[in-house]
Amino acid sequence: MKTLSEDRRALHRIPETGCRLPETAAYLRGALAEMPCTLLAPWEDAVCAYFDLGKDETVAVRSDMDALPVTERTGLPFASAHPGRMHACGHDGHMAMVLGLARRLAAGEIRPQRNVLLIFEPAEETTGGAAPICATGLLERYHVTRVFGMHLWPELPAGVIASRAGAMMSRSCELTVEITGRSVHLARFAEGCDALDAAARLLTRLYALAEGKPCLLRFGKMESGSARNAVSDHTHLEGSLRCLDDGLYAALWEQAQAIGRAVGEETGCTVTMTCKIGRAHV
């Protein structure tokens, strides 16, 4: 447990984002280099370690590596040393856990019925590193028949592992909304097309659409207007749509676009909604 904690805290201090994670990758390679495994670098700063146990098949265990663009204000002695970046989603813990597995394999404390491939994936929070890693043929080359992953869940009691049949983690989609209106002085607002008003209507209706459904439809960023005394002529919104069910996902996106068209007609604004589809549910 001491080594797990030390690894987690060391990794917590050096959070990096995206697919270029030189410090994180160096830490992992340094720890794994002492073990009887083959180190691999299939894509960008991904780190993989292959433990050959002389079996025909291989099982893979995967951890994400990247952090979030969040400023840490915990005041902890092992807090982030990189301003504006933080392991706020538990990936430091995931890496420490997989390193712990590697140490047990190296020490012969466990003898699986298959070879073991450990995969540390960059860019999980952004573009996703899994697809480009798979595209290298890594899984086929090492005869991987199954891949296991996990995610820390602070709401669960200590020592409890939760799972279920079917989808566990949702499909994701990055939503972007551009609303274009016409700016006039606030005193003559009725002569303009208020992009901020349109955004407010759109937000409240989209949130109402998702209420009570097994999904997430929320926006985390909105930028609008240029002056306190002028009607906004442009609003930019960024959000996320996540669902466990593909049918619900498609229905919500169709209804969201219909709401956007209705708001545009009501306000005289042009409402453009785009959906960048992310990875499928797991």
Which sequence ranges carry the predicted segments?
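A structural signal for isolated positions on well-ordered beta-strands in alpha/beta enzyme cores
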Residues: A60, L117-I119, T272
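Histidine/acidic-residue-rich, glycine-tolerant segments that coordinate divalent metal ions
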Residues: L68-V70, L76-M86, D92-G93, G108-K221, ...
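Alpha-helical scaffold segments in soluble metabolic enzymes
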Residues: E6, A10, Y27-G30, G100, ...
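Generic structural signal for well-ordered, non-membrane alpha-helical segments
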Residues: M1-L4, T17, L21-A25, H94, ...
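Metal-dependent amide/peptide-bond hydrolase catalytic core
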Residues: L196-H281
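Acidic/His- and Gly-rich active-site-bordering loop/insert found
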Residues: M1-H87, A96, R103-P112
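Conserved beta-strand termini and adjacent loop/short-helix elements that scaffold enzyme active sites
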Residues: P42-E44, E121, T274-K276
